[in-house]
Amino acid sequence: MASYPTFDLNSPRDLSGVYTQEQIDKMSDDDYKNALYSLWTNYCVSESYEPGSTFKPVTVASALEEGVVKDGDTYTCNGYEMIGPDRLKCHVYSSGGHGTITIEQAVMNSCNPYMIHLALELGNEKFAAYQSLFGFGKTTGIDLPGETMGIVYGNKMTTIDAACNSFGQTINVNMMQMMSAYCSIINGGMLYQPHIVKRIESANGEVVKENKATLVRQTVTMSTSKLLRRYLKSTVETGTAKKVAVTGYSVAGKTGTAQKSPRSENKWLISFIGHAPADNPKFAIYVIIDEPDGTTGTSGSSADVLTLSHDILEKLLPYMSVYKDSLEPETDTGTAEDEYTVDGVPEGSIQNTATENLQNMPSIN
């Protein structure tokens, strides 16, 4: 778990890594305090945000569980859906939509109209109930202070709320909620209370404290879990997340591009949530770049978070002794089409990652 910008624990009030001296000199006392609080805040648990398309696996899993969609079912995306007077667009709106696609292709290509269709078929009450089942709107119980609950509509959900929630807008979550929900979707349906430390041992090897895996509840069946793993694997192999692929390993996951409020400011939050190995998960990763501006040396678009996710996995998997697959897929090095291009936003990019070890999850072969 990490956030950037960060601070030196030996000099926690040093803002020089984030602000120029001129900016610091101009700060009022309140501005200075707020800058410190912002720097010290653990984004992964204490900040909530609209997740965007990384929420789509939750929508799809809920719909599969309720039987409102089956593997192979198709829906026609014309580039938008009308909810009353509101036109909710797909990211390929300008080209006329995705056409008739399967549910797997909807995940691979991040189709909004298909997700809206699923939410409407579920109905407001059931969709809200599944959000609660996956842990949204409540704390995860992680052993860190200051966890936010996020914001959900619950029994006040309207049709337009459900439609927007289906692709991760107008719902606020924290990173650990998303990570916990995602892990339950791909590990066979088991939602666990997350912990930072598994065990504390003394210098002579005695166990001082041990956090045993605590099962909270089951969210989905094994059959739904296997389908989502397949869909998410396809998303990395041939869908919107091709840039995350790591040579020699099977990786699965979902991209996200969320427009921040107020919408008129045209600011974005881009993300990737995924796991490896794809068919037998050992690790999950969640990476966010808040308001990308290209200062990482790339484009300031959703490609940035995919490159960062790839780089993390490329180092993480061999370091944690995860064996390569027998067949090594080719890593996509071309320019994959982004869900959105997000250029020209102000400075202040924040990169956040949350990674969870799934070694103690039940076998899901």
What is each of the regions a protein language model found here?
Residues 291-304:
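A short acidic/glycine-rich loop-to-helix N-cap element
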Residues 1-53, 58-289, 355-365:
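Beta-lactam-recognizing serine transpeptidase/beta-lactamase-like catalytic domain environment
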Residues 207-209, 303-365:
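Short, gly/Ser/Thr-rich active-site loops of penicillin-recognizing serine hydrolases
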Residues 282, 294-296, 319:
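Intrinsically disordered, low-complexity acidic/polar segments
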